[in-house]
């Protein structure tokens, strides 16, 4: 793993000259990518901050406390060769494919203010708005366009170190999202939310 990381890390300056290590995964294997995240979080130099970009082939990623049988339509997953993996952080199940880009920040958390998910999500929304995409941070951990989610985010905290990761759906297959994820009845209180597909969207159609 260490040799692989040495081949794919780069450094760039941000926040007035502070060095952040950039890691771009060469793999679309979900097991590899989640292992890479954990390795960087647990084993890499804690004096450094890290930013990762990665993609998974067709995969459902469930939160650390979720029941896979409750969250995933296993028949659909098997038929479509969709992997099911568990991440370190909590939160809900999300679908990944190559139309989705995942990002991860790993840094030291000085106090509770560093755990505010909006600190990570708001710059993404602002960047998209600068491109005339009407993105908004809403709820506890989502970024949406016109009320439809395109980014889910979650965090993991251990010994003063925080991992924040999220999804960016550019051109994911929304029909698969609807088929493979089970949604509890309380998610459908709004009459506008007729299906999973009705509540999610891609970024690409809104880009100029």
Label the predicted regions.
Residues 17-69, 155, 180, 200-208:
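Active-site loop/lid in soluble adenylation, ligation, and acyl-transfer enzymes
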Residues 71-93:
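Active-site cofactor/substrate anionic-group-binding motifs, chiefly glycine-
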Residues 88-108, 186-205:
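Residues forming anionic-ligand binding surfaces in small-molecule and nucleic-acid pockets
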């Amino acid at each position: 793993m260490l040799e692989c990381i040495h081949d794919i890390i780069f450094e760039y300056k941000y926040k007035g000259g502070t060095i952040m290590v950039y890691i771009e995964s060469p793999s679309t294997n979900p097991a590899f990518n989640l292992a890479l995240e954990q390795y960087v979080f647990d084993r890499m130099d804690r004096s450094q901050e890290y930013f990762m970009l990665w993609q998974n082939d067709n995969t459902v990623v469930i939160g650390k406390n979720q029941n896979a049988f409750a969250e995933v339509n296993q028949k659909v997953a098997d038929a479509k060769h969709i992997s099911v993996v568990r991440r370190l952080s909590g939160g809900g199940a999300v679908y990944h494919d190559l139309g989705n880009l995942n990002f991860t920040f790993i840094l030291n958390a000085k106090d509770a203010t560093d755990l505010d998910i909006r600190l990570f999500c708001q710059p993404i929304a602002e960047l998209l708005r600068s491109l005339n995409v009407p993105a908004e941070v809403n709820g506890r951990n989502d970024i949406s366009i016109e009320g439809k989610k395109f980014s889910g985010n979650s965090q993991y905290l251990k010994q003063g170190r925080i991992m924040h990761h999220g999804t960016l759906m550019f051109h994911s297959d929304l029909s698969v999202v609807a088929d493979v994820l089970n949604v509890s009845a309380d998610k459908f209180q709004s009459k506008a939310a007729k299906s999973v597909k009705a509540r999610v969207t891609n970024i690409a159609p809104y880009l100029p």
